[in-house]
From Swiss-Prot:
This is Protein tweety homolog 2. Forms cis-homodimers in the presence of Ca(+2) and forms monomers and trans-dimers in the absence of Ca(2+). It catalyses: chloride(in) = chloride(out); L-glutamate(out) = L-glutamate(in). Residues 1-44, 109-213, 262-388 are extracellular. It is found in: Cell membrane. The keyword Zinc does not apply.
Length: 534
């Protein structure tokens, strides 16, 4: 198998984050080596978060200054800029909503990538923990069999073979081989502390990741709801919704900056680990595990010597020697001492079980299994995990920009709605042509209507409050009006529909139209004499 350095290569974004300046609170450069217990290194990560917090403060100051200036500025002539302001608010809200939706989409992808990376890490840690716990279980089981069960069988056989010195010598030799096996098993590393650490890390990582994933999911949904409700408030021109969403937008803006600080500092710290993970693991290895063993699992090279080879070889040879001795006693001693057969078969079964345990221990101690888990954990946290954190950082940045634009646009929408209400209410209540009078006329059809000034009947004056003038209109004039209506409209009729009932003001005539109408009146007798002959 190739070395870990060939199989695992940190991605470019890890090196990019690792090469960012590591500065402590005194503005002094610190080492970028991952060491979370070092106070200086902790300050470098906190400095990244504080720098983003400073950017958030500048952003909030800008938004606050903009809102104050917008509220304190003098009222200008809004008639010329009403359409421009409305269009600007609409486009700002639309772009902010689209930007927020794009940010949420990026955030969903980043959240999923980070979750996959942490899941791969915990899965690999659980596999490694299972392997190490299996080694400890097999070693302790084999030691117990060699110390207790074998001693009981040998004690009874010593009593049975007391008269035969050669058989007693064989039993003592097997006792010596069992001691060698116990000694070699004791020399193997005790993985109990390491497996407990792996189990604790995996459990804590799973719990933290669950709440992190759930928190971001709630944040995504909240951002989308704020954008949708803001658009709804603009569409319905609701001041209450706009005011509520203004407060929610400010809260979402602060949450976006806070998440950006957390994600960036976490990405920088994880990248520092991913650049040189072997160095950190060597420094954190418990004292009972030697550096040779750690190197064996970290690099897993075929050219590297197996640190367990000698112990396993002695174990195998001792078992083989004991099995040969038991075979000889079964062949030669059982015919003379039939009562010894049960204990000899018990020792043979114990040796067969120990040999099976030896094969399992050899397979579990091989570097390929644990090294595979190690590489999968690195790929999960350094590829998917850091990549997901970068996408989440991009989400937070875009969301901050979107909510900044949205918060700045909502007061202008408020002013536009207020100006619209003032224009709507600034009308004469006695004006029969204002919108309110038109609505009343539509909803109250039984109300007395004013007669049209242009209709034939109203020109005679039909209202009771007005004194009608003397009747000067003849039948010929009525026929003349009907014929004019026939010429211009196609059908002779009286115009009996009041203009006010239609919701339109009385007509006005330009001088040109009046001259044209008078000239047509002068020529009308000739035309009417042809149309209606006497």
């Amino acid at each position: 198998m190739a070395t870990a350095r060939v199989e695992y290569i940190a991605p470019w974004w890890v090196y990019w984050l690792h090469n960012l300046p590591h500065v402590d609170f005194s503005l002094q450069r610190e080492s970028g080596d991952f060491n979370p217990k070092d106070p200086g290194y902790q300050q470098t990560l906190l400095f990244v978060a504080l720098f983003i917090a400073l950017c958030a403060a500048v952003n909030l100051l800008f938004v606050s200054g903009y809102l104050i200036c917008l509220c304190c500025c003098k009222k200008e002539d809004e008639t010329e800029t009403k359409m421009t302001s409305s269009c600007c608010v609409t486009w700002t809200a639309a772009v902010s909503g689209l930007l927020c939706c794009a940010a949420v989409g990026i955030g969903f992808y980043g959240n999923s990538e980070t979750n996959d990376g942490v899941y791969q890490l915990t899965y690999s840690l659980d596999n490694a923990n299972h392997t190490l716990a299996g080694i400890d279980s097999l070693v302790s089981n084999t030691n117990a069999k060699m110390k207790e069960d074998l001693d009981q069988h040998l004690f009874r056989l010593n009593e049975i073979f007391a008269a035969r010195g050669d058989y007693i010598q064989s039993l003592r030799f097997m006792q010596q081989m069992a001691g060698n096996i116990i000694q070699q098993l004791t020399s193997l590393p005790n993985w109990q502390g390491t497996s407990v650490n792996f189990s604790e890390i995996a459990r804590n990582a799973s719990i933290i990741e669950y709440y992190r994933w759930l928190s971001y999911l709630i944040l995504f949904i909240t951002d989308v709801v704020i954008c949708l409700v803001t658009c709804l408030g603009l569409a319905k021109k609701s001041k209450c919704l706009l005011l509520t969403m203004l407060c929610c937008g400010l809260i979402a803006l602060m949450l976006s900056w806070a998440s950006l600080a957390l994600e960036t500092s976490s990405a920088v710290g994880t990248s520092d680990f991913c650049v040189a993970p072997d160095k950190f693991i060597l420094n954190m290895t418990p004292d009972q595990i030697t550096a040779d063993v750690v190197h064996y699992y970290l690099y897993c090279s075929q050219s590297q010597r197996n640190p367990f080879q000698q112990a396993l070889t002695v174990f195998q040879r001792s078992l083989t020697t004991m099995q040969i001795q038991i075979q000889g006693l079964l062949q030669f001693a059982v015919p003379l001492f039939p009562t010894a057969q049960k204990d000899l078969l018990g020792i043979q079964l114990l040796l067969n079980t120990s040999e099976s345990n030896l094969h399992q221990i050899t397979a579990l101690l091989d570097c390929r299994g644990l090294h595979k888990d190690y590489l999968e954990a690195l790929i999960g946290i350094c590829y998917d995990g850091v990549e997901g954190l970068l996408y989440l950082s991009l989400f937070s940045l875009l969301a901050a920009v979107a909510f900044t634009a949205m918060v700045c646009a909502m007061p202008r929408a408020w002013k536009h709605l207020a100006a619209r209400d003032r224009d709507y209410n600034d009308v004469d209540d006695e004006d029969p042509f204002n919108p309110q009078a038109r609505r009343i006329a539509v909803h109250n059809p039984n109300r007395g209507q004013l007669r049209s000034f242009c209709s034939y009947s109203s020109s005679l004056g039909s209202q009771a409050s007005l004194q009608p003038p003397a009747q000067t209109v003849s039948n010929a004039q009525a026929a003349e009006y009907m014929n004019q209506a026939a010429l211009f409209g196609g059908n002779p009729r009286y115009e009996n529909v009041p203009l006010i009932g239609r919701g339109s003001p009385p007509p006005t005539y330009s001088p040109t139209m009046r001259a044209t109408y008078l000239s047509m009146n002068e020529e009308s007798p000739n035309i009417y004499s042809n149309v209606f002959p006497a």
